[in-house]
Amino acid sequence: MLQNTFTWLDEHYDKIAVEEAIQGDPAVPWTILRLPMVYGPGDPLHRFFPLLKRATDGRSSILLSEDLAGWRGPRGYVENVAHAIAVVATSDQAAGRIYNICEEPSLSELAWQSKIAKQMNWHGKFVVLPRGQTPKHLLQPGNAAQHVVASSERIRTELGYEDLVEIEETIRRTIAWEQQNPPSALNPQQFDYGAEDAALANVP
């Protein structure tokens, strides 16, 4: 899905190489911003949609593979990320510095989805399964045992950055946008409830 949306993303994509090239050029004044997974209104990946659809469809249980449930990665709400970029761009102190932009703390995928579900007043339960027992359409590529955890302490302490929108409100706004702007095309295999029910039937 990432490559379908971002066609420039391939196996040669490497941001670190770009950072090193910029830092190695004494003629170029630089500041490096490391951005998170950005969510919110306008998200081309519709990150909230699979959970919202299952809840709306009346699913009482939502499955996560064990490795994905525990995975942690940096997230940021679109307005907060834009504000952080503006703070850096207008600061004389930012030259020659590297800043991570992300929410604090970095929640596990299970904790994150639980916060979204709570905002939706969904009263079902999350069921965490070993990867080998998880339906194939729910498995994510990559190595979920490798967390991607960043700290935004530097931009907060050095430049005084603060989130403009608190996390509960960011989730509420994103849910509202997703409900009003569902994806134009759905992959039915992504919502194979028969396979999910079969996996649930084998849970002790």
Regions found by a protein language model. Give the residues of each.
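Conserved Rossmann-fold NAD(P)-dependent oxidoreductase catalytic core, especially the SDR/UDP-sugar
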Residues: 1-16, 24
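Generic structural signal for alpha-helix termini and adjacent loop/cap motifs
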Residues: 58, 91-92, 177-181
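Short, surface-exposed alpha-helical segments at coil->helix boundaries
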Residues: 16-19, 49, 110, 149
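Conserved beta-loop-beta element that borders a ligand/cofactor-binding pocket
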Residues: 18-42
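A conserved pocket-lining segment of Rossmann-fold NAD(P)-dependent short-chain dehydrogenase/reductase
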Residues: 54-76, 84
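Mid/C-terminal beta-alpha module of Rossmann-like enzyme folds, strongest
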Residues: 84-147, 152-154, 158, 172, ...
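Conserved loop-to-helix N-cap of the C-terminal "lid" that shapes the substrate pocket in Rossmann-like
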Residues: 32, 67, 74-82, 98, ...
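Glycine-rich "substrate-gating" loop/helix at the edge of Rossmann-like oxidoreductase active sites
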Residues: 9, 36-46, 66-79, 103-105
